[in-house]
Amino acid sequence: MELTLDEVLYKGVEAHRIGEIEEADRFYTAILQAQPNHPDANHNMGILAVSVGKTQEALPFFKTALLANSSIVQFWLSYIDALIRLGRKADAQAVFDQARGKGVKGKAVDQMEQRLSELAANQQDPPSDQLQPVLNLYTQG
């Protein structure tokens, strides 16, 4: 008996849920071989990649998921989170702004906005009164 894509996706999600990463990867890969732009399989492959420390490799999966279905809030959040993890804060902010422009909203989106604001605040240069003593020490050798 051949499984439908939804059944294979369910099996992948279940394998992922119980920590069988290789099995989940196998199911998601099977879906993507049949339907390369499948939004859920792409998103879940991105989540798998992040979970094993391959965040850079997750980006194309998240982007494909978004292109296939930009109405799913979690797709946006996962993509933005991956960009933040990679230190690409400006890209994360740009994607967030794009999401807002498409009408994406909700509590999790508001929380992401707060997170991005905090990251931006932490990037600012320190006040000159804090910098001057360090500069003085540096110039003194």
Model regions and ranges:
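Register position in tetratricopeptide repeats
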Residues: 17-18, 51-52, 85, 118-119, ...
